[in-house]
Amino acid sequence: MSFLQKFRKFAMRGNVVDLAVGIIIGAAFGKIVSSLVANVIMPQLGLLIGGIDFKQFSWVLKPAQGDTPAVVMKYGIFLQNIFDFIIVAFAVFCIIKLINRNASQRGGKTRRAVQTECGRDAAYRDPRSLETTKQRHGAGYNDD
C-alpha cells in the first residue's frame, strides 16, 4: 500500500472526520462566545461598574517618544479573554453533565462509570484492553 493510500485510509476513518468536525464547530462556538462577551456581557458589566470600557484598560510601560510608539500592556483585553474561557468551560461542563445524565437515564453506563466499577483502566472489559493492561502491569495480572 502506498503512502498516499495509507494517508487516505487514515484520514477517512470515522475518528479523524469526527475530530475535524468537532474542531470546526468548536472554532465557530468560540467566535460566538467571544462576541457574546465583547458585545453583551462586558458592556453591561462596565455599565454596572460606572461606564467603564474594559477593552481600554491598559498600563503604559514606556511612553511614546517621537516616532517610537508607546509600549502598552492591554490587560482589559486579557480580562475579556478570561471571561471567554470561563463561558466556554461552563458550556462544555453543562454539555458533559447533560450527556452523562442522559446516559444514566437510559440505563447505559458512561466509560468513566465502567472504569470506576472495574477499579482499573480496562474499559468495557474489552479483551484488547485487558491485553494492554497486562502489558502495562505485567504478565501476572488477571482480570478477576
From Swiss-Prot:
Keyword tRNA processing: no
Any single GO CC term annotated in Swiss-Prot or TrEMBL for this entry: plasma membrane
One Pfam family hit: MscL
Gene3D superfamilies given in the database record: Large-conductance mechanosensitive channel, MscL, domain 1
Primary location recorded for the protein, binned into one broad class: membrane
Annotated stretches, region: Disordered: 105-144
Keyword annotations: Cell inner membrane, Cell membrane, Ion channel, Ion transport, Membrane, Transmembrane, Transmembrane helix, Transport
Membrane spanning stretches: 21-41, 76-96
Subunit comment: Homopentamer.
Protein family membership: Belongs to the MscL family.
Name of the molecule in the record: Large-conductance mechanosensitive channel
Lineage per the UniProt record: Bacteria, Pseudomonadati, Pseudomonadota, Gammaproteobacteria, Enterobacterales
